[in-house]
């Protein structure tokens, strides 16, 4: 049993399709909204929605921070997730970290997307590669969390 619970951590989950329906219901046209250049994430942070994105971010962090760790990731998606988990369960998985995305190719190819997979992937890649922050540790937003104690127990937050 887990020593803490997260049952209250999420209030709602929406797919892009549901978000689009809300926009339509409230007559919101995203193309008429003022454009804002959001460039506070590294290319690695922006790629979390694609299979292998989290693994790439961790590899970049390990390389840049100099931390010594035996990182043997197994990025997997789609039906391969079940096979990967079964191999891990019986001790036959060659890695020590599983990045599992239930949707083949990651969230960008999920059931709730509103664009064809190839078009979504191309747009995703173009936007992500346009970022000026090319390393995890170069993200200035991290400075806002320097005082966060990652060793605390959840009961200490109360």
What are these model-derived regions, one by one?
Residues 1-158:
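Iron-sulfur-associated redox domains of electron-transfer enzymes in respiratory
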């Amino acid at each position: 049993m887990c020593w803490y619970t997260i049952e209250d951590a999420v209030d709602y989950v929406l797919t892009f399709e549901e978000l689009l329906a809300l926009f339509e219901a409230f007559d919101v046209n995203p193309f008429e909204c003022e454009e804002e250049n959001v460039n506070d994430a590294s290319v690695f942070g922006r790629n979390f929605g694609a299979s292998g994105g989290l693994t790439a971010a961790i590899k970049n962090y390990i390389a840049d921070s100099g931390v010594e760790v035996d990182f043997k990731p197994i990025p997997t998606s789609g039906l391969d997730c079940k096979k990967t988990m079964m191999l891990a369960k019986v001790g036959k998985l060659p890695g020590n970290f599983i990045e599992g995305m239930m949707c083949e190719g990651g969230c960008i190819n999920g059931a709730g997307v509103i664009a064809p997979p190839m078009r979504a992937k191309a747009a995703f890649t173009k936007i992500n590669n346009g970022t000026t922050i090319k390393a995890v540790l170069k993200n200035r937003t991290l400075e806002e969390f320097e005082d966060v104690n990652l060793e605390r127990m959840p009961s200490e937050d109360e």
